[in-house]
Amino acid sequence: MAKEKKVEQITDMEVDFAQWFTDVCIKAELVDYSDVKGLFIMRPYGYAIWENIQKILDGKFKATGHQNVAMPMLIPESLLQKEKDHVEGFAPECAWVTMGGSEELPERLCVRPTSETLFCQHWSHIVHSWRDLPCLYNQWCSVMRWEKTTRPFLRGREFLWQEGHTLHATEAEARKETLQMLEIYAETCEQELAMPVIRGNKTDKEKFAGAVNTYTIECMMHDHKALQSGTSHYFGDGFARAFDITYTDKNNQQAYPHQTSWGMSTRVIGGLIMTHGDNSGLVLPPHIAPIQVIVLPIAAHKPGVTEKAEELVARLKAAGLRAQGDFSDNSPGWKFANWEMKGVPLRVEIGPKDIEAGHCVAVRRDNGEKITVALDELEARIPELLETVQQGLFDKAKRNLDEHTYAAHSLAEAKELQEKNGGFIKTMWCGDLACELEMKDKAGMSSRCIPFQQEHLDDVCPVCGKPAKCMIYWGVAY
């Protein structure tokens, strides 16, 4: 009964998926609300997930030659306006500072929604020669975008992210960088977060403000909606021209450098929740779980049980695992439900009979399977089980993606498939904006990406009947 009471605090996802998501965020102690709409407090458990993702990404960035920097939070309005497409894309979401103390500022300052303009202004001061290139920078920070509709992790007015910004001598180098960073995001999602992705190009309508090309990784959530989980942008030399960034090349000629930017945010935590979670709460992949193993003493009042549980925690920590024991006076049922809600990948139970038999019982969070583990094999078996859980979560998510991706050969069929099944609908496309808008208007789907891995489904666009140029994914997105 105690377990049921704990779990019933979470709305079933089949009843109301949006409320289920909010319940999990709050009940699992990931976030709390602040007094300002859209500004969320990230609690220690939620922040620990972000720290683990951050550590993985930061290592990959540094391994590819990138350096961390810190740019100011405030951008002068005149600076933001230097690149026309960029400012038009972000103007509706900007938050402005107009007062400094009791004095009105001579120029409005934008709280950064992204930092391209700040990096460009800096580079205009320091880049003069081909020897100054490439500039490979990244920063970890928060940004502000004044969203109208807000939700924890998915749509916050302030959110944490990393934004990489690089400057290169040639288009080829910049394009290589753009794709390299997209692949880092894809590998992180698939290998660390157990979230399968579709890699591809954004359409001109959906690309980043000021970009020549935007590349994306798209993930499918448990409710079969899409989540854009990371993007990488090639800007050409547009920003360089706007900010007068020039360098002397190896032929002693003046040239404009080529620019990229790429970002991943705490939105991926929302993706984690919606990809792996269930009606008991979070289900976390072991690679990024703040606690990988929770050890629970059963019949803790019996002699030697608590001591043995403490010993197991110490051994697991010594083996390099993130392990913790629950020695509170709550009932076993309450503890089971609590740690299930928090998504801990493995629960290890140890009681008097287990000690006598020389084993413990490991319980997988993802499927509830119970595995007997000999105590003298603990350090070998538990890491193996964690890897099994990690792979199992990826495989389950990949099945969800594959089973809910459909091919359509007409607009009517695309609409019918989406309304009946949700998921991704793949069709051919002529490349015209008018057909993209009609798909949105008639079938309620936006373009997700033009995948790198192309298939030939038809010769013509299903919307207009003109010759098709590519295959494209459509879907309803967060």
What are these regions (language model features)?
Residues 1-478:
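NTP/phosphate- and nucleic-acid-binding module
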